[in-house]
Amino acid sequence: MKKEISGIPIREKIEKNLTNEIENLKEKEIVPKLATIRVGADSGQIFYEKAITKRSEKYGISCDNFIFEEGIMENEVEGLIIRLNEDENIHGIIILMPLPRYIDQKKLSNMINPDKDIDAITDVSYSKLLSAEDKGNTFFACTAEACMEILYNSSEEVKGKKVTIFGRSLRVGKPLALMMMNDNATITVCHTKTKEEDAILAAKNADIVVLATGNTGGYDRRYFRDGQIVIDVGTGKGKDGKIAGDLDLEDVLSAGIDISYTPVPGGVGAVTTTLLLRNVVKAAKMKFPR
């Protein structure tokens, strides 16, 4: 039977500990604070920005949103990052993706102070993941970590499983592949240069399929079989104008294929935002360890 894997109970579980940690910091007159940076008006960016702001308000975390219109000079965004790095009241910085093509994403990302890199986008953070290093001061890419949290909390062991990941971004595909390999899964990564027939075969052969390409509704019945777990990371606009994922759920279910899947919204995104804010709190605690 088909099964919806909601991220909301997992979020609520994380929230309990997070709320206590925030209260402990506030007793020391420390208010966790993050800054979001958005260039342009991509629907996925705006959706995530709103979710971060809403959750921050709920938890009592301070959140500043910095918004630039597309066409802004790159050096103006660089200047903002420098100022945020120097601001002792800012504990975390996140650049909302995607950035316009004319902006050097890697350059901007690596300008973030690694101690404030709450979404693990810098080379420093990525190198720690490559070396499987975690000494308590390591941040992991929140969306990738959310996928792992969902599997763990669904009592799904990754060890020994065949996993196919669609997408190779620095925020999801690449870090998630490394996390799963560190947990002894067998990984296949499909991307824009993968032939469609090979991608379909790789998906059908997998126990777990992760969709993280932003190709809204792009994965239909051809990619799936009974008994699979599908983690849908996509957040785009569906045909009805509402937020939708990469999975064409209607087509898959109408074909009578029984899968377990994360909904959009209410799946991966629900966990991702809370993990991001947990990292803000972690960054604040690292700065004021006592």
Report the location of each language-model feature:
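Positively charged, low-complexity intrinsically disordered leader regions
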Residues: 1-30
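Short beta-strand segments enriched in small/hydrophobic residues
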Residues: 31-40
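Short beta-strand segments
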Residues: 38, 94-98, 212
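Glycine-rich phosphate/diphosphate-binding loop of Rossmann-like nucleotide-binding domains
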Residues: 39-53, 137-229, 233, 238, ...
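Short beta-strand elements in bilobed, periplasmic/extracellular small-molecule ligand-binding domains
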Residues: 56-70, 187-190
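Short, well-structured alpha-helical segments in soluble
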Residues: 76-88
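Anion-binding alpha/beta catalytic cores of soluble intermediary-metabolism enzymes, centered on
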Residues: 94-158, 217
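Rossmann-fold NAD(P)-binding glycine/threonine-rich loop
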Residues: 106-117, 126-127, 234-288
